[in-house]
């Protein structure tokens, strides 16, 4: 989809270049020009040109080159009917050199139009494609950035590949968070990754015809294999790396192979890497040498046929890893690069799946939005589809994954919610306050001993500090009682969510009531209808998570 003004203003050189290049890759192209003004019913354009008379899509993917955004309800309905991904091809108002040098990429002012609004319409993979080049003094021409066009074409091709390749032939990497290296910490924010979510995903993939090998898919087998052979190892434990190589079945990337892949990266990235970490052969993290002294990067994997389970690599040395995980400037070590380059060039992944909130890839150094090959997230994800199950209530960091990691977000539920209730000490205190008031009404003098005991317990529990009380009096004892009631009524998450599994009936009801309790503007039948709808949505959420995951793997 292209703005009609580019045709009327003779700004179509970049369109010709793009069409020729995509046709050379074996694709048919249907360029459609439409008005960029509001109120021109773009949904009719989609219906007319991209959906056949029998309601089937005529295209595998839709590329929007800086045109309209489909945020109106009627437009979004048509996009859902079309049922193919819409890629956000970004046209910048700056020139190529300024964009390449920019530390921001797309400034805040333009980010809302070029990135945020398309996100609301469901567009994915925001890709800088076109810039304005100055010609003579007063003429500016839109030009396609050559290397960005290749990446964009690769993304379109790989989406089409997911749509057409048989599931049994697809190779998928399931990537989970393992920090710190050498420890048994495998998980994500409020998500039961190991073994439950991985089990749920593998079982569904086997049902969908993916080659998951002949191994049993059960909780114990997954847990034991991942804990034995699917964890990162710190640089301080070379013996553990040797043990993994000899007893497990890791991927060994020869140093010379890594160098071939490494040389495909930009000069800027290679210079930064070697300034921080030295040359590849100087690496120590997750490096193993055979009896002849040949060096390999070790990548832990657990293989299930064409599916691999693998931990996201360490962000940096353990002694300062905490400061590195969100550091905007420090590049990742060589093994981190070897990992993602292997997934692209060695494993030939049809898709990557980053399981749970959140990993480190989208936080690597580079532009804030509108990334290019000098930016680590873009340089490592390249054109490989990135599917990312992500907790639904963490919108801000999910946007980071979309904009910097090219992620297609699959929202998953939070853990179930219920009333927090009180711990035994607070419960006894609340009971003691009630007994005190009862005794005070009968015998004020005999209740004084109870009051002194309550004051001691309140100070021991620190409630006076919570409420910033200098002294505890009979009057503010009521404030403490109200505070305990507030704590008791608070909603809190219970346990972890398992991707693809709805809460049981009791937790579904409790979570429904937690949500309904925050709805202050509904009453009577409206409130009951809202309660019923929420409960139905929670009950079917598990299946819908897996359905959305499979649609993403199908390029939909």
Model-based region annotation:
Residues 1-556:
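Ligand/cofactor-recognition surfaces for anionic moieties
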């Amino acid at each position: 989809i292209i703005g009609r003004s580019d045709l009327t203003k003779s700004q179509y050189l970049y369109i010709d270049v793009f069409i020729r290049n995509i046709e050379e890759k074996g694709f048919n192209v249907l360029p459609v020009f439409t008005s960029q003004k509001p109120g021109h019913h773009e949904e009719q354009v989609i219906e007319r040109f991209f959906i056949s008379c029998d309601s089937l899509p005529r295209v595998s993917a839709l590329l929007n080159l800086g045109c309209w955004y489909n945020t109106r309800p009627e437009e979004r309905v048509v996009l859902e009917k079309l049922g193919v991904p819409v890629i956000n091809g970004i046209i910048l108002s700056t020139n190529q050199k300024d964009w390449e040098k920019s530390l921001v990429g797309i400034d805040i002012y333009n980010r809302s139009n070029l990135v945020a609004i398309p996100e609301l319409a469901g567009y994915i993979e925001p890709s800088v494609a076109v810039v304005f080049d100055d010609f003579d003094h007063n003429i500016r021409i839109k030009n396609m950035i050559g290397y960005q066009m290749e990446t964009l074409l690769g993304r379109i091709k790989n989406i089409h590949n997911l749509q057409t390749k048989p599931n049994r032939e697809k190779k998928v990497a399931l990537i989970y968070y393992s920090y710190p290296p050498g420890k048994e910490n495998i998980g994500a924010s409020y998500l039961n990754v190991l073994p439950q979510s991985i089990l749920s995903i593998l079982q569904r993939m086997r049902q969908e015809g993916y080659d998951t090998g002949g191994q049993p898919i059960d909780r114990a087998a997954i847990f034991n294999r991942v804990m034995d052979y699917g964890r990162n190892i710190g640089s301080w434990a070379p013996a553990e790396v040797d043990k993994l190589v000899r007893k497990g079945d890791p991927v060994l990337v020869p140093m010379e192979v890594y160098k071939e892949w490494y040389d495909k990266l930009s000069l800027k990235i290679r210079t930064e890497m070697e300034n921080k970490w030295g040359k590849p052969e100087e690496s120590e993290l997750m490096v193993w040498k055979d009896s002849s002294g040949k060096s390999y990067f070790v990548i832990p994997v657990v293989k299930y046929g064409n599916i691999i389970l693998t931990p996201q690599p360490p962000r940096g040395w353990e002694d300062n890893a905490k400061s590195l995980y969100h550091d905007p400037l420090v590049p990742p070590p060589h093994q981190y690069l070897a990992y993602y380059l292997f997934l692209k060039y060695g494993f030939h992944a049809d898709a990557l799946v980053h399981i749970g909130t959140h990993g480190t890839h989208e936080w690597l150094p580079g532009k804030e939005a509108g990334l290019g090959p000098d930016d680590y997230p873009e340089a490592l994800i390249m054109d490989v589809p990135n599917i990312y199950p992500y907790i639904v209530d963490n919108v801000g960091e999910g946007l980071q994954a979309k904009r910097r990691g090219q992620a297609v977000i699959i929202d998953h539920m939070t853990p179930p919610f219920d009333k927090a209730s009180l711990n035994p000490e607070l419960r006894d205190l609340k009971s003691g306050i009630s007994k005190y008031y009862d005794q005070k009404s009968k015998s004020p003098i005999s209740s004084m001993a109870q009051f002194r005991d309550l004051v001691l317990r309140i100070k021991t529990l620190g409630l006076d500090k919570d409420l910033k009380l200098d002294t505890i009096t009979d009057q503010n004892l009521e404030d403490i009682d109200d505070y305990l009631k507030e704590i008791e009524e608070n909603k809190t998450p219970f346990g972890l969510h398992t991707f693809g599994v709805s809460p049981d009936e009791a937790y579904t009801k409790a979570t429904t009531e937690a949500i309904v309790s925050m709805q202050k503007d509904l009453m009577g039948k409206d409130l009951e209808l809202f309660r019923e709808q929420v409960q139905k949505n929670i009950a079917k959420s598990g299946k819908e998570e897996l359905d959305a995951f499979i649609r993403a793997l199908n390029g939909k």
